[in-house]
Amino acid sequence: MKKITRIGIGGPVGSGKTAVIETITPRLIALGIKPLIITNDVVTTEDAKQVRRTLHGVLIEEKIVGVETGACPHTAVREDPSMNIAAVEELEDKYPDSDVILIESGGDNLTLTFSPALADFYIYVIDVAAGDKIPRKNGAGVCQSDILVINKKDLAPYVGASLEVMARDSKLMRGKKPFLFTNCKTGEGVDDLLQLILDMALFDVRTRPPLAASA
């Protein structure tokens, strides 16, 4: 059976993790890349239900699974990811021709990371509305993730946040690791995020030219 790439998506509550999945998935499918989706909630499967509604007609419901962890979000993706690994393996067995599994953690604090037993690669999502101090708080998710997404950039003037300060601090905290600003409502920055994912995580399954060349 071929290796299906596992991409974790973490971040605080309300930062836009689900929105990232909902905007990235149709773009992956348009490129011929076959995704599966797992969402995590502590006591519900509400995110999975929302993703099924949003992606109705785009991805069949059976390929979107909700995991009710019953525990701290980072425990379910780092210290003891057994429930998620079981969900991953079940999906892989049912859909072995898939290319990527997107695994959304429950909303958590800035220390969230993914166990390498669960995810090959992970994206951390923060949002501008939480304040421009967030990147310099030295959270493991901000500093160690493969890609940092700073979402809701359009809200900066309404909350007194400086995108320039966030960019400066992200560079300081992350070194050469990439970060970018997005607005998942309008799609701004989403194609750039997709290109990073293709180049960094899905290079072994992508056989198509870059987005700009294939448009």
UniProtKB/Swiss-Prot annotation:
GO terms for cellular component: cytoplasm. GTP binds at residues 11-18. Signal peptide: none annotated. Keywords: Chaperone, Cytoplasm, GTP-binding, Nickel insertion, Nucleotide-binding. Its main location: cytoplasm. HAMAP family: UreG. One of its GO terms (biological process) is urea catabolic process. Homodimer. UreD, UreF and UreG form a complex that acts as a GTP-hydrolysis-dependent molecular chaperone, activating the urease apoprotein by helping to assemble the nickel containing metallocenter of UreC. The UreE protein probably delivers the nickel. Belongs to the SIMIBI class G3E GTPase family. UreG subfamily. It holds the Pfam family cobW. Facilitates the functional incorporation of the urease nickel metallocenter. This process requires GTP hydrolysis, probably effectuated by UreG. Transmembrane segments: none annotated. NCBIfam families: ureG (TIGR00101). It comes from the Bacteria. The keyword Heme does not apply. The lineage of its organism: Bacteria, Pseudomonadati, Pseudomonadota, Alphaproteobacteria, Hyphomicrobiales. The keyword Zinc does not apply. GO terms for molecular function: GTP binding; GTPase activity; nickel cation binding. It is found in: Cytoplasm. This is Urease accessory protein UreG 2.
